[in-house]
Amino acid sequence: MVDVIICEELKKICPEMTLGCIQAHVEVESSSDSLWKEINDYCEVLKKEMHIEELASLPRIKEGREIYKKLGKAPSKYRLSSEALIRRILQGKGVYKINNIVDINNLISLKSKFPAGSYNIENLHNPISLMIGKEDEQYKGIGKEQINMENIPLLTDSIGSFGSPTSDSERAMITSNASEILMCIYSFSGKTDIDEYLKYGKEILEKYANAKDIKIKIIK
């Protein structure tokens, strides 16, 4: 299992910061009709059951927003990826169809309300840590320009930063040539319910990505 630690500096501000990690060998391909139906069906459930005004008060999103405020980041400008994804759906914009791994990642995030990110292990270089973004820290987000990552919880390796609960970098993004992934679920409120979604993640990775050699770890 890839070794990931949470830095003490971040723990002081967010003592309950937790990462739920899944490492697996997978087959990256276009999402099957059955996976895409599962995603679309859940999007319809969200549209029926939720109003956009309620988003910021959902416990897992609210907890993340409060930590961002403590870190000095405006949570409405630097939204959690789970909040941004659900907002798109409630605005009628739908979900981007990328590949089965990214789409599974998004489904887990939609259902759990936790931000989640998936990374190509081949492009990661130990040691890996979750830390607070330093002054002038930035990277090119997936489908975005350079993003100011200062004072945001940030996954970094020996080369630099590559992921966060807000937006991931292009360096470790999942493309068709990825064969082994690290999927991270970000919780600002401890391990409660992370077990449930790690189990769910394992199941749908096996079902829709032929995942093998699956390892699961909770990091606090």
Language-model-derived ranges and their functions:
Residues 1-220:
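Charge-biased, low-complexity intrinsically disordered regions
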